[in-house]
Amino acid sequence: ILASNADVIIIDPEREYSALVKALGGEIINISATSPSHINAMDMNKEYGDGANPVILKSEFIMSLCEQLIGGNNLGAKQKSIIDRCTASVYRTYQQNDYTGTVPTLQDFRAELLKQDEPEAKEIALAIELFTHGSLNTFAKQTNVDTNNRLICYDILDLGKQLMPIGMLVVLDSILNRITQN
């Protein structure tokens, strides 16, 4: 790693790489319900999706995330339409500002769901409340870690059973964001 320009991204389920990453000046991102480190599940850069409309691809991700947040059940057509509409709405200002400024969060997304008239929107908002305003809201806040370091270690040891599927989705999406930037 020291002799190349390559970026190295590690997903560490057993906390085996922390000492090495620290010694090499990398960023260790501890992910858990109680960690002060946060990755915004809705982070998105201009290149997200490799040339396609980033919001369309992010909407697909948010649908997958909502499926996990709701309990792994498949979303119906109405729910998908509502999620797609709300995703486009919360990203509108960010997109109009050429993907600069404050990135929306899952809290913004939930607030947008609550503005909708359909009862299904209220149901989705209630189902994701634990992950936006409750004790498992670690992915509903602005990112406060350096995801641009050449060496990143996502430490997922303390993620826990409830957050593991969601955490893996968010970590992989964060990595996609990083890869498409390059």
Where are these regions (language model features)?
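Glycine-rich phosphate-binding P-loop
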Residues: I1
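Conserved RecA-like ASCE P-loop NTPase motor core of nucleic-acid helicases/translocases
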Residues: D7-I11
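Hydrophobic multi-pass inner-membrane translocation pores used for secretion
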Residues: N5, I29-I31
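P-loop NTPase motor domains
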Residues: R15-G26, A33-S35, N40-N182
